[in-house]
Amino acid sequence: MRATVILVLWLSALAVSAAQTRSVFPGTLDQHPAIDYKNATAADPASQLQRVVEGGAPLTFEGEQGYLRAVLSRLNVPVESQILVFSKTGIQHPFTGPENPRALYFNDRVVVGYIPGAPLIEMASHDPRQGVMFRTLAQDASRAAFARPDRCISCHLSSNSLDVPGILVRSMSTAADGRPMPQDGSFVIDHRAPLEQRWA
């Protein structure tokens, strides 16, 4: 009984603390000065790669895969980590589907996304201060151009990521062409999710 009371009091204190934080700082936490997501100098692996390339270091462009192998090599992301996403999700969703899945490669700090025929390589890279930073690299042999599109956080900034930019894995029903069908329900996936929710 005593343990239950202590747990309830502790959870209540957390709720009050969260409410106080929200009332002191209106807006999403990515805008908080401690994070300053859009303006602070980033120190994540993808931003470091961007600075090196923009400083003059070459990035090899190879055939249909473009910069993919060079990016994986520079970021120490193993090719063997590949997983495939068959749904039409992400900022390049028109290019993905059951016949042309998005390949994701990852290590402990970076996720690299590649879609055959798509104009961009996608990167989600962990910064020790700002959290997950989202970048793209144009598949243009004449110039390795990096960008930080705001539209990534339209999905990757929510209560599911604790109101800061973060990685989100969700399982949901899809139509035959890969279009998501959220009306049929969805599950946010992490290490606690039961196997029957990880089917999509």
Q: Where do the language-model regions lie?
A:
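Bacterial N-terminal signal peptides
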Residues: 5-15
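A generic alpha-helix preference that emphasizes hydrophobic side chains
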Residues: 16-17, 152
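Flexible loop/turn segments at secondary-structure boundaries
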Residues: 92-94, 162
